[in-house]
Amino acid sequence: IKRKFGDSIRERKWGNKKKIVSLMAIVYNIHVIVRGGGENQFLILLVSLSFKSLKIDVCNRAFIIYYLSKQVIEMGKKFTQELWREIEDIYKSILSHPFLKGLTDGSLDENSFRFYVIQDALYLREFARTLSIAAAKSPREKWIMMFNEHSLGALKVERALHESFFRDFGLKKTDILNTPLAPTNLAYTSYLLAVAYSCPFSEIIGAVLPCYWIYWEVGKALVSKGSPNPLYQRWIDTYAGEEYSKIVEAVLTLTEEIARELKNAEKKAFKRHFVTTSRFEWMFWDMGFRCEQWPV
């Protein structure tokens, strides 16, 4: 503590001016500690335990505790902001992709749409498996429950796609199950499952978050524009429910909570998976647009 805060804590006879300067020095250094990352947060505990030896009065203790709490909360929130800044260009590329533009202006080839929806159903099955593994590795009971519910929800969405769209396409469930994963779909889902099986809980969240978050943001953009094609409009309407918004917000809140406990190296790993699967999100739309097939 003395090495961190210097002479300000050695002073035993504080006058008003010296007290203010000393408190400013302490608060500034606490700010540096908190902004430095989760691995330094144990120093916050040392500071709080040192209040008595530092002879800091009750009012100033309250101020420092308030400041610490606020900074820790802000640090968590800013992590999700950092994440979004990492993928802003990717997200802009998704919004400008001809698949999405074709949805909203009605020009998208229906074969591309059909291909996409089928592959999306196949994706959801593997995504559900990934979420089940996330639940198994969750360090908190509430997260175990949440991801098990999300896994079940993904399977329900797959079933709803069959009931609403696949019947229109004249497809049976066996037709979907016998459809092979397109190259991009196989790569994306294989990556998710590899992370889920081999990485810690925080990295799994980094890998699955873009599917939640980008899909939500894209959905809001699509809903605001609509489509002249009734089939596409019906699909866009699936984005409009408030229930999905609550699901995404819960995962974002979880991300902020996780970030407060991560070391810098762990945050980098989180971001690496987050950016990679965000790229896969763009590739998935592109896969649908091109009706991607194996080249050989």
Predicted segment positions?
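Long amphipathic all-alpha helical oligomerization modules
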Residues: Y244-F274
